[in-house]
Amino acid sequence: MSKHKGPVDPESLPYRPCVGLMVLNKAGLVWAGRRIVIPGDEMDGATQLWQMPQGGIDKGEEPLEAAIRELYEETGMKSVSLLEEASDWINYDLPPHLVGQALKGKYRGQTQKWFAYRFEGDESEIAINPPPGGHTAEFDRWEWKPMVKLPELIVPFKRKVYEEVVAAFRHLVA
């Protein structure tokens, strides 16, 4: 939580560099996890809690490295093969009431580089609660979902991102 007391001008804050991962199974369905809501985070008060894995890019880390790391930290998945990298970075802005609070109060939203992977392993390797390596659980459930349904499952302020991601990777299930 930010210690800032008044309204924060979003234009004064940067976007947090992140990666997002669309993981498809052999049937062409996409892995989605239901977020655990933490009071004060960007999902607080949301009812659409399903999302694909995503996370920050550490200083000095390449996006592809961050993608593999985040996927493992959030889901335990290692048995994946890269299908494609989205050509563009996709941004989203936090809603005004979350600027200065969510994302540790440091960012106006995220700029995300998306990757599509094929899950090649056995579902028994998927571990979300607890995830491997002592990481904090981000999801309490997971399911394979049809790609076209993803935008309606995500919190509304990230919906445009999911529409763009689905458009970028739709051909992978055609």
Curated annotation (Swiss-Prot):
Any one biological process term the GO annotation gives: ribose phosphate metabolic process
Gene for this chain: rppH
Protein name: RNA pyrophosphohydrolase
Cofactor(s) it depends on: a divalent metal cation
Residues in Nudix hydrolase domain copies: 14-167
Keywords: Hydrolase
Gene3D superfamilies associated with the record: Nucleoside Triphosphate Pyrophosphohydrolase (3.90.79.10)
CDD domains assigned: NUDIX_Ap4A_hydrolase_plant_like (cd03671)
Task performed by this protein: Accelerates the degradation of transcripts by removing pyrophosphate from the 5'-end of triphosphorylated RNA, leading to a more labile monophosphorylated state that can stimulate subsequent ribonuclease cleavage.
SS bonds (residue pairs): none
Organism expressing this protein natively: Brucella anthropi (strain ATCC 49188 / DSM 6882 / CCUG 24695 / JCM 21032 / LMG 3331 / NBRC 15819 / NCTC 12168 / Alc 37) (Ochrobactrum anthropi)
EC numbers, comma separated: 3.6.1.-
Keyword Thylakoid part of the UniProt annotation: no
Family that this chain belongs to: Belongs to the Nudix hydrolase family. RppH subfamily.
Motif (Nudix box): 55-76
PANTHER family cross-referenced by the UniProt entry: NUDIX HYDROLASE 26, CHLOROPLASTIC (PTHR11839:SF22), UDP/ADP-SUGAR PYROPHOSPHATASE (PTHR11839)
GO molecular function: bis(5'-adenosyl)-pentaphosphatase activity; guanosine-3',5'-bis(diphosphate) 3'-diphosphatase activity
